[in-house]
UniProtKB/Swiss-Prot annotation:
Kelch repeat residues: 273-319, 320-363, 365-408, 410-447, 448-480
UniProt cross-references to Pfam families, sorted A to Z: BACK (PF07707), BTB (PF00651), Kelch_1 (PF01344)
Organism for this UniProt entry: Vaccinia virus (strain Western Reserve) (VACV)
Domain of life: Viruses
Induction (record text): Expressed in the early phase of the viral replicative cycle.
Role, per record: Might have a role in the suppression of host immune response.
Protein name: Immune evasion protein OPG047
Keywords: Early protein, Kelch repeat, Repeat
Domain BTB residues, every copy: 10-90
Domain BACK: 125-223
Amino acid sequence: MPIFVNTVYCKNILALSMTKKFKTIIDAIGGNIIVNSTILKKLSPYFRTHLRQKYTKNKDPVTWVCLDLDIHSLTSIVIYSYTGKVYIDSHNVVNLLRASILTSVEFIIYTCINFILRDFRKEYCVECYMMGIEYGLSNLLCHTKNFIAKHFLELEDDIIDNFDYLSMKLILESDELNVPDEDYVVDFVIKWYIKRRNKLGNLLLLIKNVIRSNYLSPRGINNVKWILDCTKIFHCDKQPRKSYKYPFIEYPMNMDQIIDIFHMCTSTHVGEVVYLIGGWMNNEIHNNAIAVNYISNNWIPIPPMNSPRLYASGIPANNKLYVVGGLPNPTSVERWFHGDAAWVNMPSLLKPRCNPAVASINNVIYVMGGHSETDTTTEYLLPNHDQWQFGPSTYYPHYKSCALVFGRRLFLVGRNAEFYCESSNTWTLIDDPIYPRDNPELIIVDNKLLLIGGFYRESYIDTIEVYNHHTYSWNIWDGK
């Protein structure tokens, strides 16, 4: 156990030991100890006050005192008062710090703080942080605040159980707060409010003071509006937190510049938010992802995927964002949504697939094509299931087709076209597009199914086609 010596105090111990000795028995938490009260009174004002003898005609040579200190910490302080030496290790340092603060023994206070800062442990950071606030220990407070902010996800339960409004605010307003996105902070504040049953006023103040609303998803914004009971959210112009700040994005940067960075990425959308996932950056496949709100014209952070991806496909389902296949791991699947701590790996596909067509009906995810130019297999994943299953095969191979659900049917269109009906579990052929296409897109405009883009035989297709559900055929769209 490390020993720390107060050399200045040691020089005075001999003189103190020559003074008249008065024995005092101190009842502490967990035991009692007999001390020389004369020496202990010289140590700090606390002991002068608490060990003072009451005046009586016949003084008892031994007095009894009760102190609200644990016996182990008190013993260490008593030994220090006799010898000028204090024994500190990671097991006793926190309790000894608290006891020395209560007893005003400054040498032990600063020795304990220096020991904690030099050999910092996660297991006592929360308690030290709260002592830093309670007793105004600025260096301890600053160090523990930064540590908790950086290890926020690991310490979340301890924070909820122990922190009041002020303790919480200092952490959540930090640029160093390590969170995957800003929605996570909103969800955390709500959990803290429910668990601790705090006053609603504290919840409102926290939301207004710590949330960086310009990086919230629509889901996060709706949660804030619900809490604040308002239709418009407050404006915040703070910089993004370091944990979700993109190193390749300069601030500020417009949406077009961000989209250009995500070259050859996978894209999908939920409402007004478009998700850009993976692709090719700096001559390599990467695992970055970002969301762009084209209504509010701001970007929303997304944590990096578990795997880099190129030629993958994305689909929203089960209130999550799924990314399927692609290089370099064409059978891998993972999912995430705003407020989640990280992407979660999902069951692998039965076949490797690149740029497969994906769609979701009733939260069942369907994957078609992307395996080979002759493959007609399909796969599906039921909600809360841990394995993909083969579905009914398509009539044609759909190596570079696209899929979209329209009118309760799953349309699969590329060089050929067909649709899937979930109730009958069958595929039905429809007329092929007028212009066969690789990698086109299906969109819905004014309740019409439109086929746009794509290329064929190294030429891009600029003609838009509209589906006629009466004739099961395609027509050139005139914009009406």
